[in-house]
Design a protein with these regions (language model features):
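Catalytic cores and adjacent flexible loops of soluble metabolic enzymes
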Residues: 4-307
Length: 307
């Protein structure tokens, strides 16, 4: 039985405004970021990760998250998650009416120390503190696991380590776990092996996937994930993003590219690819460069030929 015979709908979880923009050395203007999110709110997306309440010293591009969350035009049926790595971040998220807090962990001790300056155990303790308090305050909590297949410092990661971490995050109260191929070196077989173990630990309905396209494997890995029953995919308009603590990591898989593939498979997302392209065009114009999305560039070229 082919994938489209078993699956008719997939949820796109847009991470461009946070994971996509967080590494920009010259951040775009706050008003431009607000407009970008407002454009995304008009595309049919149900989840738009919109900011991060983190130290401006370490992530200056997210220093305006309070203003952004205050001024975006929210729609009742859309969630606007924010990254909250500690209780201070959660306090700010609550202050600015965030609906979803995001916590993160990694099975790699080396990556954990580089990324958050703490051990895996300490990171889990922080995540537990944030998750429990967020739930008390009425927020939903999403968990991220980085380096789920390969680590830039420890090489290959055992799937069972990822599964155990996912189980810990679900136990503490996360409603969903996003499995991140941080350096983009995962392949379809590795993807299936990792998801298999995580499915056994927490159930496939609790899992999402988050791929970077460093080695051009993202769409193939998404296809493999769909075959394993995954129904939530993290994407970033135009391929925005990377990871400052993962040398060589390129952008997230482009929203446009994923939508084009899913549309061609007859899988519904509810997201308008043309409106996504307009949002992508807007933010990349502000950044002064061209989107890496192949679909965006192909559609732009097609439009120019038809003028």
């Amino acid at each position: 039985m082919c994938i489209r015979d078993r699956m008719s709908e997939v949820t796109i979880y847009e991470v461009g405004p946070r994971d996509g923009l967080q590494n920009e050395k010259i951040p775009i203007e706050t008003n431009d970021k607000i407009q970008f999110i407002d454009f995304l709110s008009d595309t049919g997306l149900m989840f738009i990760e919109s900011g991060a309440f983190v130290s401006p010293k370490w992530v200056p591009a997210m220093a305006d998250s309070n203003t952004v969350l205050s001024k975006i035009v929210r729609k009742n049926d859309i969630m606007y998650p924010v990254l909250t790595p500690n209780l201070k971040g959660l306090e700010d998220a609550i202050k600015y009416n965030s609906d979803t807090a995001c916590v993160f962990a990694t099975p790699s001790e080396s990556f954990s120390k580089k990324n958050t300056n703490c051990t895996v155990k300490e990171a889990l303790h922080r995540a537990k503190e944030v998750t429990e308090e967020a739930i008390i305050k009425g927020l939903k909590v999403r968990g991220y696991i980085s380096t789920v297949m390969f680590c830039p410092y420890e090489n290959e990661i055992e799937p069972i380590k990822v599964a155990k971490l996912a189980e810990e995050l679900i136990k503490m109260g996360c409603y969903e776990i996003s499995l991140g191929d941080t350096i983009g070196s995962g392949t379809p077989i590795k993807t299936k092996e990792m998801i298999r173990d995580c499915k056994e630990a927490v159930g496939v309905e609790k899992l999402a996937v988050h791929f970077h396209d460093t080695y051009g494997q993202a769409l193939a890995n998404i296809l493999a994930s769909l075959d394993m029953g995954i129904k939530v995919i993290d994407t970033s308009v135009g391929g925005l993003g990377g990871c400052p603590y993962a040398p060589g990591a390129k952008g997230n898989v482009a929203t446009e590219d994923v939508l084009f593939m899913l549309n061609g498979m007859g899988i519904t997302t509810g997201v308008d690819i043309e409106k996504i392209c307009k949002a992508s065009e807007y933010v990349f114009e502000k950044l002064g460069r061209v989107p890496s999305s192949r679909v965006f560039n192909a559609l732009q070229s097609k439009r120019k030929r038809n003028i």
